[in-house]
Amino acid sequence: MKLKNVLIVVNDIEKSKKFYKDLFGLDVVLDNDGNVILTEGLVLQDAKIWKEFINKDITSHNHATELYFETTDIEEFGKKLDAYHEPIEYVNRLMEHSWGQKVIRFYDLDGNLIEVGSWISAD
């Protein structure tokens, strides 16, 4: 068995597709009207449909999960994020951990937590 996808709930599929394309370069692999699979295995699920599926309230900003991305140029990504046309809610702007990795944490348009870190060698 292997993990195939990670699903996040979004309020506006079109805005979310644009967000993940513009900032992370993710393309649409499959669009099933309310359920969109992007490259890298990220799935965007329409909030109204998801609520019907699970019959539970959806909790934004739950801080229980995060999407993690790595980049070779974290400073350039930070500039790209600052210039994005939608407001970005930061958890922390560019910071450096004690082990030398630089990271930025923020929420997507629907309160899903994202971390972008500088690539560090496993050596």
Q: Where are the regions that the model predicts?
A:
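Short glycine-enriched loop/turn motifs at secondary-structure junctions
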Residues: 1-3, 59-64, 97-98
